[in-house]
Amino acid sequence: ATLALEGCIVTIDAMGTQPNIAQAIRNRGADYILSLKDNQPTLAGSVEDFFVAFQANPDKTPHCFDEVVEKDHGRLEVRRCYAFDQLDCLHAPERWPDLKSFGVIASERTIKGKTTIEHRFYISSLPADAARLNQAVRLHWRVENSLHWCMDVAFGDDRMRARTGNAAH
């Protein structure tokens, strides 16, 4: 059985960021937003290097920008999303089927007066659109978090003692 993905945007965590998975998504008529981390260190490094240079002089680089501010449960979160289409700065962009853009989300969280900032990197088959990227990633995490909550409540996942190695869950 296969998933009907035509017209969808598929978001995947870093572990699933592989060219063959991107190709399978495109073969089904869908677009992808793939997370970059240590799974693709050279590609992630090229996005990070580009973003560092961009921050030094943002007016010289075409880009899209979106900002979302959420305040909830004593926490303030600001997500600043930057989307780019300068693929020539990326390491081996031709490996990624129909790659059209990449993005950075700077997530700034303030809890009890302490602020942390995390930068997350993405590649996508969609045109550079910061608002769409920001929304798609946020929806991804809403689904992810609700699934973890269901596992914790329904299956007692948090009470599981076996958490490492080859232990069955």
Where do the model's predicted regions map?
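Phosphate- and divalent-cation-binding pockets in alpha/beta enzyme and binding domains
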Residues: N20-I21, T42
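Short, positively charged, Gly/Tyr-enriched micro-motifs
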Residues: I12-Q18, I25, A162-G165
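Mobile genetic element proteins and their domesticated derivatives, centered on retroelements
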Residues: V10-D13, Y32, Y122, E144
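Conserved, well-structured functional cores that handle cations and Mg-NTP chemistry
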Residues: A1-I12, T17-N20
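Short, surface-exposed basic-aromatic patches at helix termini and helix-loop junctions that form
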Residues: A22-A30
